[in-house]
Design a protein with these regions (language model features):
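Extracellular glycan-modifying ectodomains
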Residues: 1-242, 249-250, 255-261, 354, ...
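Short hydrophobic/aromatic-enriched beta-strand-loop microsegments
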Residues: 61-64, 317-320, 365-373
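Basic, amphipathic juxtamembrane/active-site segments
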Residues: 254-279, 364-371
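Substrate-recognition element of Asp-dependent hydrolases with the DxDx(T/V) motif
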Residues: 272, 276-307, 321, 359, ...
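Conserved Lys-Pro-Asp/Glu-containing loop-to-beta segment of HAD-superfamily phosphomonoesterases
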Residues: 332-353, 359
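Terminal substrate-recognition subdomain of acyl/acetyltransferases
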Residues: 360, 364-426, 529-592
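A conserved beta-strand-loop-helix scaffold within acyl/acetyltransferase catalytic domains
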Residues: 431-511
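Acyl-donor binding region in acyl/amide transferases
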Residues: 484, 490-565
Length: 592
């Protein structure tokens, strides 16, 4: 649906929201269900409606609680039976500068202004702490947009008496809090309002007539921003950017114009535009976005273009390069298969609207933004929010390296007729241990990013993981896999709750990067051995179907679990007699 891509079609989003909701639900009949509490300092009805639409686009169906008008602080501090019973998964605090109860004047001393700043900050900090203590869920807080006038003109931003200066300092306090609290996220309306246009954003008509903090047409942009944070928290980010070459990464057609005739680099304005776009793509790679090429070109010409002396990207920046004359939708499907990623993990960037239309029609789930003018490429991708970062792990920083190592493994496999011999040749070592504090962030990230090899899709915060690790009744294991090509890092997580002589497995997931290497066998052998050492006689596993995890539907059957229950939705329960288990002894060394 093009209305959700930048630039947003606000008229369609606002006027046809019911129709859009029906279409989104029909397209995704098994969404992830989440409860979102909106605590507002202004009217929030349209905010909830638009946020619900954007989340549905990401496969998340939201149920909303909304505070009464301007009762955000009272609901947070004193509670309401409705909010308490709601048990939110996420809390969004929708406030702006109009909710400040004091602002400096030219008559105030600097000491009085500092005290005022501390008082305004404390108003919010005590609220955040109360919400954390009561609900222990992610909190998304707007920072502050700029006020509707600058009393002192340009001096307003640096003079302590200026409202602009005061709000900037207050925002900095919010950011310092966010840096220290893992469940706390800033929705940057200071940026959004500047990008939208501050005068239109803060149109006072909507405040005085309807008590909307921002103009009606800006609400979809606000909702998109909040939705990007939430979908990132629940593993719905895109993971890969697939790029065309000619007139996408450089100006011109390399097969016709030759490498010397391409527009790329500092010599001409057009070349500067494409160099800047390549720099942006390389920056995306640095935060864990994997890059690939899908271009109608001879491979030799494509590689020559990527080695242009004034280019920023090089062939080794990409995990896959499909430069041929095959249909681009088939190339993209091949890339997805090679990387073990679903099509909905990809963004496809191509200057040609015909190619975009074919890919969008033939590869459901892929995001296909409308690139219009090379000078707008960065803005279009950046405003799309496809790669919103809410956490950044060491594995993210070396994601391209990990995929290159996988390519080396695939090449090595071709030399073996026997798959077992190939696995032996990898010289793998699995390190399986409890939830080590060093890996808490990565474990939590895996629970929120892994969708395909994930039996229960239980999503956990870092605090959730710490709580499991500290409970003697919980069996918690994570696995790291190293081979001769490199270190894959933490790639699998298992957790279960022991009750008497039974162990109930609540979490089992694995990164698809290590599929078919025996890591799941190593984990199962270890789980059963650990369970037996604890006196467990029966292990119970669960499979909860989603749109993405069909590959593990019969996972437990492979290990001689017996299916003991199945409901109408396909949720299954499996049971193993520990004494009857036969270890798998995978092709790797296992260290504890």
């Amino acid at each position: 649906m093009d209305c959700f891509h930048y630039p947003l079609d606000t008229e369609t989003l606002l006027r046809k929201k019911r129709k859009l909701r029906r279409e989104l639900l029909a397209r995704n009949p098994h969404p992830l269900h989440k409860k979102i509490a909106i605590l507002g300092g202004s009217t929030t009805n349209e905010v909830a409606d638009q946020l619900g639409l954007f989340l549905l686009q990401y496969g998340i169906e939201a149920e909303f609680y909304q505070s009464e008008y301007a009762q955000y602080w009272q609901d947070a501090m004193f509670g309401t039976p409705e909010l308490d019973d709601f048990h939110p998964d996420v809390i969004y605090i929708h406030t702006n500068w109009r909710n400040l109860t004091a602002l400096p004047t030219t008559a105030d001393s600097e000491a009085a202004i500092d005290a005022m700043l501390d008082e305004q900050y404390a108003h919010f900090e005590t609220m955040w702490q109360a919400l954390e203590q009561k609900f222990a869920c992610p909190v998304i807080q707007n920072n502050f947009d700029r006020p509707n006038f600058r009393l002192m003109g340009n001096r307003d931003i640096w003079d302590p008496h200026g409202r602009s200066n005061f709000i900037s300092r207050l925002n900095q306090k919010f950011y310092a809090y966010a840096a220290l609290h893992e469940h706390f996220y800033i929705n940057d309306i200071d940026y959004l309002s500047a990008d939208y246009g501050l005068t239109a954003w803060g149109d006072a008509f909507f405040w005085h007539m309807y008590k909307y903090a921002i103009c009606l047409d800006a609400i979809p942009s606000l909702a998109n921003s909040v939705a990007n944070i939430i979908k990132s928290l629940y593993g719905r980010n895109k993971k890969a950017l697939v790029l065309d070459l000619d007139n996408t990464l450089w100006g011109g057609i390399v097969g016709d114009d030759g490498v010397d005739g391409l527009a790329i680099g500092p010599e001409v304005p057009e070349g500067q535009v494409y160099a800047e776009f390549q720099s942006y793509c390389k920056a995306l790679k640095s935060i864990g976005v994997i890059l690939a090429v899908d271009s109608k070109n001879d491979e030799a010409n494509a590689l020559a273009g990527l080695n242009h002396p004034d280019g920023v990207l090089r062939p080794d920046d990409f995990v896959a390069i499909k430069a041929n004359w095959d249909p681009k939708d088939l190339n993209l499907k091949a890339i997805a298969s090679e990387l073990n990623l679903g099509a909905d993990s990809f963004v496809f960037a191509d200057d040609n609207p015909a190619e975009r239309a074919i890919v969008a029609a033939q590869v459901p789930g892929v995001a296909v933004p409308a690139l219009d003018g090379a000078e707008n490429y960065i803005k279009t991708l950046d405003h799309g929010g496809y790669f919103e970062v809410t956490a950044l792990s060491k594995e993210d920083l070396k994601k391209t390296e990990l995929y290159h190592q996988n390519a080396e493994r695939a090449k090595a496999q071709a030399a073996f007729a026997d798959y077992g011999q190939y696995l032996d040749s990898l010289e793998m070592t699995a390190t399986i241990k409890g939830f080590d504090p060093l890996y808490i962030q990565r474990i939590a990230q895996l629970t929120n990013k892994s969708n395909q090899f994930n039996l229960t899709t239980l999503r956990c915060s870092e605090d959730d993981i710490r709580a499991m690790a500290g409970d003697r009744n919980d069996l918690c294991l994570c696995g790291k896999l190293v081979d001769k090509f490199g270190d894959n890092g933490i790639v699998t997580v298992v957790a279960g709750r022991q009750q008497g002589d039974a162990l109930d497995l609540t979490l089992w997931l694995m990164s698809c990067r290590v599929l078919k290497r025996g890591m799941e066998d190593a984990m199962m052998d270890t789980v059963v051995a650990e369970a037996a050492a604890r006196g467990v006689k029966t292990i119970v596993g669960h499979y909860y179907p989603t749109a993405k995890n069909a590959m593990v539907r019969e996972f437990y059957a492979q290990y001689d679990f017996a299916k003991t229950a199945e409901d109408a939705d396909g949720n299954t329960e499996w049971t193993l007699d520990v004494a009857a288990y036969t270890p798998k002894h995978p092709h790797m060394k296992i260290e504890r």
